[in-house]
Regions:
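Short, structured beta-strand/loop micro-motifs enriched in basic residues and often containing a Trp
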Residues: 1-6
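Acidic-basic catalytic patches of nuclease active cores, encompassing PD-(D/E)XK
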Residues: 12, 45-96, 115
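Flexible glycine-rich surface loops and low-complexity tracts that mediate binding to linear polymers
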Residues: 17-29, 33, 206-207
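Short nucleic-acid-contacting surface segments enriched for D/E, G, S/T with interspersed K/R
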Residues: 8-22, 155
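Conserved catalytic cores of phosphodiester-cleaving nucleases, focusing on short active-site segments
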Residues: 105-141, 154
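Residues at the starts of beta-strands that form the adenosine-phosphate
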Residues: 20, 120, 163-165, 201
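Domain-level recognition of nuclease-like catalytic cores that cleave nucleotide substrates
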Residues: 172-222
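Nucleic-acid nuclease catalytic cores
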Residues: 135-145, 155-184, 206
Length: 222
């Protein structure tokens, strides 16, 4: 059976022969493929030194007693779960797909400062992280010129009075932060450092993952 993989990345460390995957049946009977691949189990059978892993990841894997970890690889899921999460926060305005400059960002937000009463304008770009190496998340897993462009324009927006946020949705449990994948796309790593230096905030959105759900459970701001 041929299925559609709902991810534009490579996922080569996940989609290996013999791995367990989870499918979702399409509601479109006219599609070439009947199913979408939305999640995959990664095995950790041959880890000999769990001491190299971050504490949070070791705790999630019970110091190696757990042998598999579920990854959500649906590239459409991050924006959906972020929207649901944003609705539970104290934003007065939430606009998906907002155009600024030559880019379209995932969200435009407004929040009223409880002290000053002023309205804070926020641009947010969402990126899903599905690459984990030794308990740490990395992005991207394939070159993304669009991602570089977004970072540059997030930096520009700060000069025009916006707060700019890059939000990584971590699509596996136990991982608490995401680093730039220098080996795969050094330009993205450079752009990210410049963006952070200009004032762009980086948020790590930690998730609970099941076979058919993805839910934000914690947030780290950097």
């Amino acid at each position: 059976e041929t299925v559609h993989v709902k991810n534009t990345g490579r996922c080569k460390e996940l989609l290996i022969p013999g791995c367990n995957v989870y499918l979702e049946k399409s509601e479109n009977p006219n599609r070439k493929t009947l199913y979408d691949l939305i999640a995959v189990e990664k095995r950790y059978d041959e880890i000999f030194d769990w001491g190299i892993f971050p504490l949070a990841f070791r705790k999630r894997m019970n110091d190696g007693k757990e042998k598999t970890l579920l990854f959500n690889i649906d590239s459409q899921a991050p924006n959906k779960v972020v929207l649901e999460w944003l609705k539970k926060q104290d934003y007065s305005v939430i606009k998906p797909e907002f155009t600024f400059g030559k880019s379209r960002f995932d969200f435009y937000l407004e929040k009223i400062d409880s002290v000053t009463g002023k309205t804070e304008k926020i641009l947010m770009e969402v990126k899903g992280c599905t690459l984990e190496i030794e308990g740490v998340g990395y992005f991207p897993d394939a070159p993304t010129e669009r991602g570089v462009k977004h970072l540059n324009e997030l930096s520009d927006a700060i000069g025009e009075g916006y707060k700019s946020v890059l939000a990584f949705v971590i699509q596996m449990e136990g991982v608490t932060e995401v680093f730039p994948n220098v080996k795969t796309h050094p330009e993205f790593a450079t752009a990210l450092e410049k963006a952070k230096a200009s004032g762009v905030e980086v948020w790590f959105l930690q998730c609970g993952v099941t076979e058919d759900t993805l839910e934000i459970v914690d947030v780290n701001n950097h």
